[in-house]
Amino acid sequence: MRVTTAPKWKWILPAGGKPESVCGMNEAGVMETCGEDGIRRMVAAFYRHVPTDDLIGPMYHEADLGGAEERLAEFLLFRLGASTRYLETRGHPKLRMRHITFKIGIAERDRWLELMTAAMEETGVPPAAREFLDPFFAQVADFLRNQADR
């Protein structure tokens, strides 16, 4: 059985849990609150920190940071119901398949969440949207773990 809890990240949800089950916000509410520009600013802030990060920075190809930023922004806009561009250009997200070549353990998950949390704080993502995004990001980051001991 896979352990999905981590004391540091209180928002790791049990398997099948949904962010909206712990808050009143949903995808449409996040988009109303943040808008596409807000989501893109948040993602840009995240990627400003990636190259200098000693743990997850090496997972990203420096030459493709712009592409990675665009893919994450498009994925989030798709997942939040604002756009189908991601689906039209990339197909099904297949997140585990797309990340399987990277060793992602607890440390990597937590660092990714730290950088995303910093990006949300830096760009002023409103508390109401954070109520949805915090557990959403924690759930996705934990889902991508492929190293039990890390």
Locate the predicted segments by residue.
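Core of compact, soluble alpha-helical bundle domains
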Residues: 9-150
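Extreme N-terminal basic, low-complexity initiation segments
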Residues: 1-10
